Amino acid sequence: METSLISPMKENNTAQPQQREENTQQNLNAAVPIKQQSPGLLPEALEVGVKPDPASQILATQEIENPVAGFEGDSDKFHISTDEMAEHLQASDLWYCPDGSFVKKIIVHGHGLDKPKLGSKCRVLALGFPFGSGMPEGWTELTIGTGQWREKTWGELTEKCLESMRQGEEAKIHLPGSSTPLAKLRLDSFTNGRDSWELEAVEKEALAKEEHRRGTELFRAGNPQGAARCYGRALRLLLTLPPPGPPERTILHANLAACQLLLGHPQLAAQSCDRVLEREPGHLKALYRRGVAQAALGDLDKATADLKKVLAVDPKNRAAKEELGKVVIQGKIQDAGLARGLRKMFS
């Protein structure tokens, strides 16, 4: 009976736990223009139902058409002159996000030592996000770790910026390599929250389930970028649990690989599949997706090996057959090109 590589399904995790913790931080982030969806990429539905937190993905640098004007006026607004738009960034006032997704230019330094954490309700003045981005404009309340605002194009970047700010801080957000600010934020106040390490294991798993559930909803709605963020946040929560960790990590890595393929990141997709296959060597969807990724990377031998493993277990699997056919054709084209090159060398 054919095992569908397309429709979400429940899975039993039978693999033995791995003793080493994998370093997947880089692999939890990816976002580029969305490509046409291919068969065999839909994520599995979680057996338990629901999942949440933080894959983000590193956002692609975009051209900002409408630069943000400086804030003026009373204490409820930014105190920035328009001349500041052209000033060179001073190294002493810069904060670089560790994942490289943005640079924060501090305009007014905040006070105190505390910063927003998971669950903190932040009173924020946000101005200048690109039109249609879905991000709030003006005074708003944003809760770290929850809310649909985090699923917007600039949501996760904004959340990471807020987590780096102190009360009263005003800052401009710059994308890497851009001197024009994407937006400006002022953190007026925030409530106490908790770091992820302060959460009990059951709390982390509950948050991860909600994030997973939301990620699958977004994927089915045609938003692999938003889905990847959700899956990445769920994985980051679960990776803080003692090894081997819950079996749901296998499904999350497989789902993340599906998103990464659609987003044009075959190298990251292959790495996500590796994490799955370390725990469950016979995971058909991971084998298929890694085969697709290897083909995209030009490693036709590895692609062929993975796809043949799928067909050995499920000979009627149409998606694997079609992909293997493409790989064979691609190999013949490469061989023909090599032969022409050799003839020219010895002619």
UniProtKB/Swiss-Prot annotation:
PROSITE patterns this protein is in? TPR, TPR_REGION
> Subunit comment for this entry?
Forms a ternary complex with CDKN1A/p21 and HSP90AB1/Hsp90.
The entry's protein name is: FK506-binding protein-like
Query: TPR repeats: which residues?
Result: 208-241, 250-283, 284-317
**Where Phosphothreonine occurs along the chain?**
3
Against InterPro entries, the record matches this protein to:
FKBP4/5/8-like, TPR-like_helical_dom_sf, TPR_rpt
Keywords in UniProt for this one?
Answer: Phosphoprotein, Repeat, TPR repeat
Keyword check for Lyase: no
